[in-house]
Amino acid sequence: VGGSAPTLGDHDVSNSDIGDVSAGAYYRIFPETPTSPDVVWNVRVKAPTGKYPNGIKFRQVPNNTNLSAPDDLPTGNGVWTLSTGLTFVKTIDPAILFANVGYAHNFTRKFSDISSDPANSYGGEVDLGNSYQLGGGLAFALNERMSMSMSYAHRFAQKSRIKKDGESWQSIIGSDSSSGSLNFGVTYAMTDHLSMVTNVG
């Protein structure tokens, strides 16, 4: 890793711990009819089983005053998350139209240390902010073995906040976001039991 100064340096950090574990369920609310789409409700829970980023210290790399590296790497975000959404699917031969809308709620959590400064440690609460997502697309068969799909998804994330012990909430600048993803995919059925899927986004 190089900086703006003539000094170069590098630092290796790795973590093979487990990440956050999640589980979900899907339930068909309404089956597809000639005039209405198939509607599926989903709910998912994510547990903070991974290493959370709060309290990980950043230290100056030896012989390079412009480079700091973390003592450890996070494998999760440290909070419980509950998400839910609806998926709509409608067949219009030879195409299939689909759309989805979702919401994810991150629960506020208190940590014994939320500082990244090795010279300081202080507890506090973290609120990662909630997010909304919507998307849609279509898939259609090119022949009996090959199909193509196109989709677009957009995600809106609210600002994250931190609250040091004894102080008021502070928003983290730049933590809110609005991001979109456009995807193209092709599926080819090589056999009755094996398919090859390619995706570009």
Each language-model region and where it sits:
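A subset of solvent-exposed loop/turn segments in beta-rich extracellular surface proteins, enriched
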Residues: 1-22, 31-34, 47-67, 113-121, ...
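Residues on the lipid-exposed face of transmembrane beta-strands in outer-membrane beta-barrel proteins
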Residues: 23-27, 43, 84-90, 101-103, ...
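Transmembrane beta-strands of outer-membrane beta-barrel pores
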Residues: 20, 29, 45-51, 90-94, ...
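Hydrophobic, aromatic-enriched interface-forming segments
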Residues: 76-114
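Outer membrane beta-barrel transmembrane domains
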Residues: 110-201
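Short loop/turn motifs that connect adjacent beta-strands in outer-membrane beta-barrel proteins
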Residues: 30-39, 52-54, 94-95, 145, ...
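Residue-level detector of the transmembrane beta-barrel scaffold of outer-membrane proteins
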Residues: 1, 24, 38-42, 96-100, ...
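Residues that define the transmembrane beta-barrel architecture of outer-membrane proteins
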Residues: 16-21, 37, 78-82, 126-132, ...
